[in-house]
Amino acid sequence: MAPTSTYSYTERKRIRKSFGSRDSVLKVPYLLQMQKDAYTAFLQADMAPQKRTNEGLQAAFNAAFPIVSHNGFVEMKFVEYNLAKPAFDVRECQTRGLTFASAVRAKVQLIIYDRESSTSQSKVVKEVKEQEVYMGEVPLMTDKGSFIINGTERVIVSQLHRSPGVFFEHDKGKTHSSGKLLFSARIIPYRGSWLDFEFDPKDILYFRVDRRRKMPVTILLKAIGLNPESILANFFVNDNFRLMDSGAQMEFVADRLKGEVARFDITDKSGKVVVAKDKRITARHTRELEQSGTTHISVPEDFLIGRVVARNIVDGDTGEIVAKANEELTEALLKKLRSAGVQDLQVIYTNELDQGAYISQTLRIDETVDEFAARVAIYRMMRPGEPPTEDAVQALFQRLFYNPDTYDLSRVGRMKFNAKIGRDESTGPMVLSNDDILAVVKILVDLRNGKGEVDDIDHLGNRRVRCVGELAENQYRTGLARIEKAVKERLGQAEQEPLMPHDLINSKPISAALKEFFGASQLSQFMDQTNPLAEITHKRRVSALGPGGLTRERAGFEVRDVHVTHYGRVCPIETPEGPNIGLINSLALYARLNEYGFIETPYRRVVDGKVTDQIDYLSAIEEGKYVIAQANAALDAEGRLTGDLVSAREKGESTLLSAERVQYMDVSPAQIVSVAASLVPFLEHDDANRALMGANMSRQAVPVLRPEKPMVGTGIERVAAVDSGTVVTANRGGIVDYVDATRIVVRVNDDEAVAGEVGVDIYNLIKYQRSNQNTNIHQRPIVKKGDVLAKGDVIADGASTDLGEIAIGQNMLIAFMPWNGYNFEDSILISERVVAEDRYTSIHIEELVVMARDTKLGAEEITRDIPNLSEQQLNRLDESGIIYVGAEVQPGDTLVGKVTPKGETTLTPEEKLLRAIFGEKASDVKDTSLRVDQGSSGTVIDVQVFTREGIQRDKRAQQIIDDELKRFRLDLNDQLRIVEADAFDRIEKLLNGRVANGGPQKLAKGTKIDKAYLASVEKFHWFDIRPAEDEVATQLESIKNALEQTRHSFDLAFEEKRKKLTQGDELPAGVLKMVKVYLAVKRRLQPGDKMAGRHGNKGVVSKIVPVEDMPYMADGTPADIVLNPLGVPSRMNIGQVLEVHLGWAGKGIGQRIGDMLRDQAKAAEMRKFLEEVYNSRGRKEDLSVLSDDEVMAMAANLTNGVPYATPVFDGASEAEIKDMLKLAYPDDIKERKGLTESRTQAYLYDGRTGERFERPTTIGYMHYLKLHHLVDDKMHARSTGPYSLVTQQPLGGKAQFGGQRFGEMEVWALEAYGASYVLQEMLTVKSDDVQGRTKVYESIVKGEHAIEAGMPESFNVLVKEIRSLGLDIELERS
């Protein structure tokens, strides 16, 4: 296998050793591609208006316009739309609680036609008014694929819904007790009425519109213009008879007789009996009849009786209809036909097997006579009770399926429809045609006749994904449709009054529709931001729920189950546990959407058994046509499939097939799983249920203080970290010019710098920012000044990343052994050292908000002047009444002082006097300050003050603005300094050695410019030098212009920033001032916290043990975590054991590298050892591209352990793990550590007694995570608190500061103990006995302990409820 020769900046620092057996032909695509592409297509912001395609916003406008007035003389046309630059950037929107959006302005024309000179054919334009009209604000997507709505980051989840088109299915025999299959068909449009066709148990075919009352299908067929004759002609073939005086002659058709039982003797032309009565007719018989030249067979009279006439039979003489189409033949009718001289008779051919008389039977129960009557019947079904006038009837029928405004199949629907009914073209009209309806009924009848197969609803060829763009477009359309109605009403006025387009269009409906969708839709979700993996997974989620989708309650087992078409499209592992299982899925790693919204997955093309590098993306329907080999199929050196039989999939079934039949091959073994599942090493050794938990729990891992890369990974870590957007990557290559904790400045390479633009990139890092889940988002630079970067290199780590790789946990030394029952039932025993070293300490940031409102009694005030508070309680507030940054606060501490006016009370004369003397105002206001909640404490890290326009800013608010501006000015100055330095460097290179025509300091013409001269001249005077060469002069001029422009743009940027900061803030109605205080809380690991590995092995910390008591190895190394070995076998997640073994090897090799560095080994020696580590097994790495310094720098990074990649389904084998263990622990180290021969177990010693445990213990390193279920957030206690209004019982839950429910079983427990008094107080004074509660409180205050239990309020509620039923119930004392 070819080694990888190019390494990025971070890879050079630490290469992950991969055990993948073959390189992936296709790189993992950008993981947020689906979201970003969909929204880009919706906005088409960067496209010139003329070049925009008819999708997204453009399609919405095209559908709504032109709007024509009722009289037809005024028209409003849409020309183009533009998107304005958003007023605030993402960060500002988050801080101010705004929506990151852009205003849409549409250019529309109001055309008024001249009534006098216009005719119905040609209209003469009287005047045209063109204007740009505001059409609401459209939220913009951030770089990370999310939206900022009202200051919070949200994600629009894609929806998996049933594709428009036609579907055929049956009820699986569930409807009728006999188990008979009832077939049905359904035409589903994108917009418009659903049309269903269904058989009932009596084999009569019905249709229904929008699930209303069912009607015989022949009514619909008549309504589309067919008469009974043409209906029968469309569905049946005819048997031709010639009537004789007695009996008849039947035309001989061999295929129709085969398999039937002869009801009479069948003779040939000569009269010879070929088939005797009651014998079955076989192919031999029909052949004999054909050979004898028989064209007609004589049939007796009773053979005709019961047959159905195929067409109307008219008496030639009188013109009277003797027999109607679909009439059954009887003796009387036959007599009538003979007397009318009818000789030739056509009846429909039916049989019991494959030619049922369903349509004929349906026609018989249909009472409508003609097309209009049929349409009236449909009108009555749709609009019961309304009088069916002719116009209304025709209009309704037309509007149901034939009007593009009300019915839209969509491109997808038409494509699916045509494919289903066997048409070749994939395009066509977006409304139904009569032929379409007829074709569907024909296929349904064929299905009932046993021809063809029903559709599989859960096949991914029948389900498509609606992305953000499409969902937003639908909302925009709804808004425009409302506008269209309003405009249509008012358009007529434009003839008389001088109205402009903006007078007619009110954008409110659009804004309302979008606001409702982005703010409250089921698919618009609060982004899960616990860690980068959670973010990326949330954006790749595909939900079957939501408007137009399924509901939890109605979704059956089949919809939730894994389907064969999920392969490579939707992850079979990652889905939530609980009621949503299988309804919310995650997109597979390589999956993408095609133009129709169906999920595609890539395959390598195989030609004559040779695997090519050509990649084709196939949708689920296309995949069914091919034979596809697995990604791990054996190949020879030339890339040919080896072996006689290859494991492959055909039509969803896995089989062994010959290599010649294979047409495609999987791209990568990881292609079937999602991002989260692909980060689980040794996934192939885990049971699916546990793998599901592992994938789900890695999304709940809390970012810790110092992230640590997983020792055993899968190779996807780097991709996931970069694509999630938490790390900072270089936009362009260059050299690092400046680094500090808050920003990185890169001087861009000359070849990547755009002419006339500043050749400097400045990356401002995020510091201590609160995420949606209150975790800490924090970026740290990982580059040094002078480092050379390429485009795309990671230059700063974010939360939960380490050197550009996702790092959601810590590598811990794990021992699998029981320890005094402390790891019973998945409990986890942890060493004190882990806590002391802050390995799992995380920072959580809480946002506390206080608002000063305008109340009826006067405005609330944020102030330091709070009644009844001591100076000690106020000493951390500044003069504006706001706490200072850096203060450490405890529960109950005041953060922001606020007073609210309270209603005037009548004062006694003494109080009036006192207030007159002392000006005491305290009694007018009550203290409503913001305080720290019970159970939380921390450090104030930031304060923000927002003031409404027109309200005086306090000193604190002004100071915050000044600080912000100062910081911004510093930033700009730094940028300018670097830009200038860069410009002067370029000028120096440009002028050095050139001839000048003159310049400052009396530079003579023809003098060569050198560095000494340039150093002697002020840099700003370099522009006065006049080079002899014109080209150099123009370059110098362009640098000068670029510099001046940059200075000017910086001044403008500063002005704009100042304007933004000093203008009033947009606050909710009635709010005058808002203060946000951010608290940072340090959470250390403690008993009760939930932890987990990546294999679904979760548990709760039971005890933190002093390090000296932990089991330790022979060389004194104590274990970090002790897990129960019983957690492995029954759970069948063996991946964790393999991870522990490989992690143990990685750590051992790291320690050997550390020993070599301590012994000051030479680079060559180190290179030799690293060659052995990286290139003895698995994928080869080309270490020769690294310089000696880079090799030593990498070695220093590997001392904590060599990171491994064991790709999903292509991971390290047992032999490879054993080789690595041998390399890590040569015999001398093995002995010293007390390892067994396999090096996977060690003899441990009891930390408390020093005795050796009897049996060896499995020990090694596992990447262990701390999950977001922290005991601090769950711990809760209450004495008194809020009560429910109706029942007067304490509320429930921590958020409401509620109590614990004393339920039925707890009551039984007290009854069992006979604790009657305890039970009484539980059911009364501690619950809802209102008088009793107050009395207990009084007696406690007095120091007494008497309890008087009264009537519980819930009893009163019960009495009231009984009264509401009309039963008078009263309590009487006995």
Swiss-Prot record:
Organism: Paracidovorax citrulli (strain AAC00-1) (Acidovorax citrulli)
Swiss-Prot/TrEMBL catalytic activity: RNA(n) + a ribonucleoside 5'-triphosphate = RNA(n+1) + diphosphate
Coiled coil: none
Gene name in the database record: rpoB
Keywords from the UniProt entry: DNA-directed RNA polymerase, Nucleotidyltransferase, Transcription, Transferase
Pfam families associated with the record: RNA_pol_Rpb2_1 (PF04563), RNA_pol_Rpb2_2 (PF04561), RNA_pol_Rpb2_3 (PF04565), RNA_pol_Rpb2_45 (PF10385), RNA_pol_Rpb2_6 (PF00562), RNA_pol_Rpb2_7 (PF04560)
Protein name in UniProt: DNA-directed RNA polymerase subunit beta
Disulfide bonding pattern of the chain: none
Gene Ontology molecular function, alphabetical: DNA binding; DNA-directed RNA polymerase activity; ribonucleoside binding
Superkingdom of origin: Bacteria
